[in-house]
Amino acid sequence: MIKYFSGDYDVIVIGGGHAGCEAALAASRMGCRTLMCTMNLDSIAMMPCNPNIGGTAKGHLVKEIDALGGEMGVNIDKTFIQSRMLNISKGPAVHSLRAQADKVRYSEVMRNVLENQEDLYLRQIEVISLDIEDGKVKGIVTKNGACFTANTIVLATGTYLRSRIIIGEVNYSGGPSGLFPANELSQSLIDVGIKLRRFKTGTPARINKRSVDFSKMVEQPGDERIIPFSFLNDKLEKEQISCYLTYTNEKTHEVIKENIDRSPLYNGTIKSVGPRYCPSIEDKVMRFPDKQQHQIFIEPEGENTNDLYVGGMSSSLPEEVQIKMLKTVPGLEDVEILKTAYAIEYDCIDPTQLKLSLEFKDVKGLFGAGQFNGSSGYEEAASQGIIAGINAALMVKNKEPLILGRSDGYIGVLIDDLVTKGTNEPYRMMTSRAEYRLLLRQDNADLRLTELGHKIGLVDENRYEKFIGRKNAIEEELNRLKKVQITNKKEVNDFLEGLGSVSLKKPISLYELIRRPELDYDKLQTLDIDRKDLAQDIIDEVNIMIKYEGYIEKQLEQVDQFKKFEKRVIPEDIDYNSIKNLRTEAIQKLSKLRPVNLGQASRISGVSPSDISVLMIYLDYYFKNK
């Protein structure tokens, strides 16, 4: 192959999925000349699995991406076909927004944004190797011989590296949704010392809407009030498309059990690790034999298509078994398959090879993002993509990287978990992973992160002005409510008793009254004669901040303690073998992972509290005598 020089860039992003899109947009919006290389320009921001954005904990990630100046929230607001707020029966910390996407339009609109972004250049081309010299990024080589130079590279290769499609006894080299795999780049990564491993994921069949009997299913319409993902949008209105719920049964399970020896998961064909929280239908049936039924969600993939996604029925069983299995489900008796379910195996890295900035520890200027890092999900990928893109741009500008901590956002939790703890399976974000989830609500993502996004140059003035307006409105309303006094007049007490609340014995502020469990901002509207006409999102924020004030203050105290550990920096050149009384396992783990501070060290599996105490004493001595 004859190679030729084809251009010089500040940042090169390899991959055009959800991680690659956010990385490329972040870097270019921060003023860096950026090249995005993708196998197929028509598959940008493709949704090869579920046709939705958000969901439990994932909705938090999308809100945080948006607050930093990312695109995912803006894009789904333009292309959704149904919107629902999940977990509304629980507290606000776990409320999570989820939207069904028109997956074709989602991809088209995102591509249009990329094509019109200043300083961003797109190429449909396969990258086959990296040019690394003396542990530093120099550029890339493509299959056609084109060579591009760059100061930084973001690897966002998704599930394409040496990917294999598995359907029963059928097993072949291929990427998701019928696309080509990337079979050559992996060896280049191995050659520069990057450790790879194999993960697997899967997707359900797609079926023809015309072959489904919806009368045998439970309709799931969207919410009446549509809450936007992006803080740029005050409200959205749209005629929504329903999803449907049905269930497997004993007949379904019998088909699976009769053919379990043909399942690649159970006959040894698939040896790689799959996502724990998204098991295949055969896995669910075999692992939970006492369960008589499993939920199946029938989800539309767009407005102008008959494609339906069969959620909850991911499988790698042979095609004829899949058809037989589907036809046992109520409403699917005459089902026609459009696309067969499959499992896909692919190369990814052990993310403990990365710094918290998502730069590789041993290759300067090389960043990883998305499923390449061992995560699962569009939202997790996009979250890493925006941080990798930001930090690639900051490196080009010779500035310090942006590190989000566990108390800053779900993105911080996600990255810290991957980099510090590693993962033995595709990592999925969950609210239970966040220690400070009452502080990290999706409704306050802008209050936590937009100032930061503006400071680094990613949040533009239009978004920043909108943020300042919202922030000021919330603060002004909180201050006003503290000043409004409600007297203990008879009509007031009668009103309160009618709401099931205790009558007043002396005047009290409206702020204090809202704190009562049985009352809220809207219920007390009658008593608030000077109430302003505020947007619903501001009302919701004010209500939450008042009602959960005590709990929020306690978590802020916990964060203060946590940050004391995070501020105790560990020198890069520390020799753990020279520290007396440190256990052998701790020496090995700390030497391998090289934590940057005591907080990160304390979260490493195999490092005990006594090891941290020894390390603290050593650091005191080290800095005292330096």
UniProtKB/Swiss-Prot annotation:
NAD-binding protein involved in the addition of a carboxymethylaminomethyl (cmnm) group at the wobble position (U34) of certain tRNAs, forming tRNA-cmnm(5)s(2)U34. SMART domains: GIDA_assoc_3. InterPro entries: FAD/NAD-bd_sf, GIDA_C_N, MnmG, MnmG-rel, MnmG-rel_CS, MnmG_C, MnmG_C_subdom, MnmG_C_subdom_sf. This is tRNA uridine 5-carboxymethylaminomethyl modification enzyme MnmG. NCBIfam families: mnmG_gidA (TIGR00136). Homodimer. Heterotetramer of two MnmE and two MnmG subunits. PANTHER family: GLUCOSE INHIBITED DIVISION PROTEIN A, PROTEIN MTO1 HOMOLOG, MITOCHONDRIAL. Transmembrane segments: none annotated. The keyword Transmembrane helix does not apply. Keywords: Cytoplasm, FAD, Flavoprotein, NAD, tRNA processing. GO terms for molecular function: flavin adenine dinucleotide binding. NAD(+) binds at residues 274-288. One of its GO terms (biological process) is tRNA wobble uridine modification. Belongs to the MnmG family. GO terms for cellular component: cytosol. It comes from the Bacteria. It is found in: Cytoplasm. FAD binds at G15, G16, G17, H18, A19, G20. Its cofactor is FAD. HAMAP family: MnmG_GidA. It comes from Clostridium acetobutylicum (strain ATCC 824 / DSM 792 / JCM 1419 / IAM 19013 / LMG 5710 / NBRC 13948 / NRRL B-527 / VKM B-1787 / 2291 / W). Pfam families: GIDA, GIDA_C_1st, SAM_GIDA_C.
